[in-house]
């Protein structure tokens, strides 16, 4: 007999009192039987189950052999008894990380409680959340034959009957959004036809959906998992569809100011994306917000920097109504001279979002000439409605970023004869988005790379030409791009009527330099997390802090600032508080791996107006998608994170039970003994590729067939997966993954013959005219009534063919040809056609049981089952004193044997506890 193993605790570990007498690991039939037996003896039992319900695999079955009694009718009373037993505590949706035994004989159990995102104390199990959930995932209860919802109750007879939200992490599209917009959520809602709900979800995070649907650079699409396959989901186009549809139906917002208004006042300096976002979120919290804008109109960069052919100004106007509807007061032509003035006016906090509205100069001769301007100066005039006649003129734009592309394309629409973008590096190094560059070239903009202005040439104070130098690329600079080096003697002159300098923008923060700390580049010094400045009541964000950035980033900064301004005004600490902690991003490789049968759905190309039509007006270049196109595009979403955070369940729940802020919890318990009842694993038919499982839809395994036959089955009858046809010629292939050295599993699984006979008889009950054939090597009928059960099957007309199946091939009509060795017919190779084949897969050891105890202390037998020290004289006793094993964790067993073995394990545990009490 092997010696028992003990893990020694460090001497400074204090003595502990056990919380429970017994820990039972696993809530299947073995775990429940052991727990109930010990609970009835008066012992305190902790039952830990990793799923959201107890019941194990028995609850999945249709009926039990050989009596053909209802599996649910037997198991559900036991589940209820376990759940309500006064001496049993069930800890569901939890996993054990490690179990260690100390010198005091007690076991320390480290637990990981997985978040359900539902308060089970409040949940009534009504199922309303499942009805409205927009994400479909494979249904494990029905062997993945059909879908269930991400928010779901495990199965109809679940104990407890409580909802769980499947969140694998945050979807890459949502995780990468700087504003925290739940892209996965609104895409899923559009897919479900819930367009208004999609709009409202967006408004929870960002109040400028119309502007974002046109001018956002869509980092979400860049991270879309589908983009690694045949093309990204058109997230921005889907957003535009839902926004345009909503705005057409709602010219003004449906809501007004909040009912509860706080006494504190907040000033926002600047009405660009950051300022508007902060004002919106602060107003929703009940603050009285005033926005000060120096320009004649509201919108900042949205209005003055982005041309109408990309972002129509009526869309900006409608977006701004989302903010003013909350009671936000926006004062245009109201520049703020000092922050002290705002304090004197009674404002309790200030959000400084002055933006970057000033361009840099090149510092070359002639820059003061009439006809030399910066990109913001040019765009302000053009977008502000000032008449600019560029007909017949040559315009040059210096720079390689997006701020260079917009003036160039705008100049063409204003009638310029020739437009040149001059950039000192190569096109490869241009920071502008490639699609923007392509659009400019398509419209006729010339690209002059590896050139830079040396001086501007004028006549009578007006620009006439530019003298440029040719450049070559040298060694990389601090940015990682190769440094441009002038080529001596390469000067060349180009006639130019208008020069637009798009070489960068600087923040409009100079008026506040004496009051708050600024960086050398003029940006505001603000805490990266809280955005609080050197003046405690002043917060700052957007381009004023980051320098020139993207709209969505500025919106995110405004949202962040509102969170911390709210805490500041409530007198709460800003230290140690994190703003929006999403779940970790989902690994794209894992997403692709879990969708092996993905149907390729090519992405629809972006549609634009013809070039001639574009240049004739300021009409939007990009054309909208139709409702059908939007939903089709949304249907390509892979639901990377599981739950999409659409919050439909939150709105539908009458008990208010959903809490998406839940996170994984760690816990420790101390117990006196352990029963391992982790059950078994089923053989994966894919490991026998010649049998076609996973390749041919009409090759299924026995668990899938059990679900098709169960009273709670996914369909009204037995249907084959490929076409929904009722099969009339069904085959069973026994010993799939059992007694097979090619898959390293030499053992007989004991139950496959009988469960196949059970299913065959049930099939004849459901499909009386069906032909059922069982391919077998031999039939194991060792239990009480098993031989009679076999004879009963033969008497019902089920065919038995003694022979080993070698291969299964699919016919064009979905039928399957089975190639087998006909042992009783002379041993020759035969072929038989069936329209559905069931693989009677074997039972495998659950190796997770061995990993519960660090260091390999829990020994296994030669087949990786938990080893019993002496299965005849000491059934259930393992290599660790005080640890016992029950059911199929130690060997393949049928249900009656599992119940008996669990009783033995419980008896052994009780005897061990008595010995501990006596100190022997």
Per-segment meaning from a language model:
Residues 2-13, 51-77, 91-122, 134-172, ...:
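Non-heme iron-sulfur electron-transfer modules
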Residues 8-9, 139-161, 368-393, 476-548, ...:
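FAD-site-proximal beta/loop scaffold in flavoenzymes
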Residues 19-21, 93, 120, 262-265, ...:
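Phosphate-coordination loops involved in phosphoryl transfer and adenosine-cofactor binding
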Residues 20-84, 149-153, 172, 178-192, ...:
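Beta1-alpha1 glycine-rich phosphate/pyrophosphate-binding loop at the start
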Residues 77-119, 312-361, 373-391, 413-521, ...:
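A Rossmann-like FAD-binding core segment of flavoenzymes
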Residues 123-129, 133, 173, 177-178, ...:
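Short cysteine clusters
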Residues 391-425, 483-498, 522, 530-531, ...:
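Long hydrophobic segments that form regular secondary structure
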Residues 407, 544-569, 743-755, 886-916:
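A conserved FAD-binding loop/helix module that cradles the flavin
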């Amino acid at each position: 007999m092997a010696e028992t193993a003990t893990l020694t605790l460090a001497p400074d570990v204090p003595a502990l009192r056990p919380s429970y007498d017994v820990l039972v690991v696993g809530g299947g039939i073995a775990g429940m039987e052991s727990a109930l037996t010990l609970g009835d003896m008066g012992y305190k039992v902790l039952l830990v189950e990793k799923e959201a319900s107890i019941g194990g695999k028995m609850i999945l079955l249709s009926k039990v052999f050989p009596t053909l009694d209802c599996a649910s009718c037997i198991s559900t009373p036991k589940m209820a008894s376990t759940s309500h037993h006064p001496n049993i505590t069930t800890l569901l949706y939890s996993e054990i990380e490690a179990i260690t035994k100390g010198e005091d004989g007690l076991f320390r159990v480290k637990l990981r409680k997985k978040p359900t995102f539902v308060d089970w104390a409040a949940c009534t199990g009504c199922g309303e959340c499942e009805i409205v959930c927009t994400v479909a995932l494979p249904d494990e209860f029905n062997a993945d034959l059909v879908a269930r919802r991400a928010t779901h109750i495990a199965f109809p007879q679940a104990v407890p009957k409580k909802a769980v939200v499947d969140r694998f992490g945050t979807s890459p599209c949502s995780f990468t959004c700087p504003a925290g917009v739940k892209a996965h959520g609104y895409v899923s809602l559009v897919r479900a036809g819930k367009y208004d709900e999609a709009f409202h979800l967006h408004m929870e995070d960002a109040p400028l959906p119309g502007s974002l649907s046109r001018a956002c650079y869509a980092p979400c699409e860049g991270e879309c998992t589908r983009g690694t396959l045949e093309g990204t989901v058109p997230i921005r186009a889907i957003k535009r569809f839902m926004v345009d549809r909503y705005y057409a139906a709602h010219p003004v917002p449906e809501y007004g100011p909040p009912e509860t208004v706080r006494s504190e006042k907040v000033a926002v300096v600047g009405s660009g994306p950051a300022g508007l976002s902060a004002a919106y979120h602060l107003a929703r919290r009940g603050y009285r917000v005033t926005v000060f804008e120096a320009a004649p109109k509201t919108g900042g960069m949205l209005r003055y920097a982005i041309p109408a052919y990309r972002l129509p100004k009526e869309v900006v106007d409608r977006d701004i109504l989302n903010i003013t509807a909350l009671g936000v007061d926006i004062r245009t032509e109201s520049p703020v001279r000092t922050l002290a003035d705002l304090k004197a006016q009674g404002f309790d906090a200030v959000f400084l979002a002055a933006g970057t509205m000033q361009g840099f100069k090149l510092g070359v001769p002639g820059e003061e000439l009439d006809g030399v301007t910066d990109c913001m100066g040019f765009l302000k005039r053009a977008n502000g409605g000032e008449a600019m006649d560029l007909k017949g003129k040559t315009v040059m734009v210096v720079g390689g970023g997006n701020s260079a592309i917009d003036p160039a394309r705008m100049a063409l629409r204003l009638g310029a004869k020739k437009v040149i973008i001059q950039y000192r590096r190569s096109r490869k190094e241009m920071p502008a988005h490639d699609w923007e560059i392509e659009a400019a070239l398509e419209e006729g903009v010339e690209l002059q790379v590896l050139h830079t202005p040396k001086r501007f040439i004028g006549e009578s104070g007006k620009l006439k030409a530019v003298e440029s130098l040719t450049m070559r690329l040298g060694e990389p600079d601090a940015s990682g791009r190769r440094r441009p080096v002038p080529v001596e003697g390469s000067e060349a002159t180009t006639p130019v009527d208008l020069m637009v300098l798009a070489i960068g923008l600087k923040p409009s923060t100079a008026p506040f330099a004496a009051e708050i700390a600024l960086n050398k580049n003029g940006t505001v010094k603000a805490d990266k997390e809280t955005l609080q400045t050197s003046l405690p009541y002043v917060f700052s964000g957007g381009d004023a802090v980051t320098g020139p950035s993207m709209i969505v980033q500025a919106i995110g900064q405004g949202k962040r600032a509102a969170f911390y301004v709210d805490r500041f005004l409530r007198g709460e600490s800003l230290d140690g508080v994190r703003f929006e902690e999403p779940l970790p991003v989902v690994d794209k490789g894992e997403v692709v791996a879990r969708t092996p049968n993905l149907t390729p759905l090519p992405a629809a190309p972006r549609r634009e107006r013809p070039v001639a039509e574009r240049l004739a007006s300021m009409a939007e270049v990009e054309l909208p998608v139709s409702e059908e196109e939007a939903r089709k595009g949304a249907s390509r979403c892979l639901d990377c994170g599981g739950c999409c955070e659409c919050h439909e369940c939150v709105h539908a729940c009458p008990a208010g039970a959903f809490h998406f802020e839940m996170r994984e919890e760690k816990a420790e318990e101390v117990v006196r003994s352990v029963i391992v009842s982790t059950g078994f694993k089923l053989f994966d038919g894919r490991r026998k590729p010649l049998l076609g499982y996973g390749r041919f839809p009409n090759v299924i395994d026995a668990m899938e067939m059990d679900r098709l036959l169960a009273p709670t089955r996914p369909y009204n009858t037995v249907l084959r997966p490929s076409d929904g046809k009722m099969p009339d010629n069904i085959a069973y292939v026994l010993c799939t993954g059992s007694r097979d050295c090619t898959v390293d599993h030499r053992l007989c699984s004991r139950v496959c013959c009988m469960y196949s006979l059970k299913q065959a008889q049930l099939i004849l009950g459901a499909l009386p005219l069906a032909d059922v054939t069982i391919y077998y090597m031999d039939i194991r009928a060792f239990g009480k009534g098993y031989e009679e059960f076999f004879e009963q099957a033969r008497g019902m007309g089920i065919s038995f063919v003694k022979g080993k199946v070698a291969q299964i091939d699919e016919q064009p009509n979905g039928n399957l040809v089975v190639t087998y060795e006909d042992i009783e017919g002379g041993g020759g190779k035969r072929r038989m056609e069936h329209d559905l084949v069931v693989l009677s897969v074997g039972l495998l050891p659950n190796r997770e049981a061995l990993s519960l105890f660090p260091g390999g202390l829990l020994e296994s037998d030669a087949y990786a089952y938990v080893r019993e020290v002496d299965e005849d004289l000491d059934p259930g006793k393992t290599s660790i004193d005080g640890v016992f094993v029950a059911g199929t964790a130690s060997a393949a067993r049928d249900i009656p044997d599992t119940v008996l073995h669990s009783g033995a394990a419980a008896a052994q545990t009780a005897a061990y506890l008595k010995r501990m009490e006596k100190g022997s």
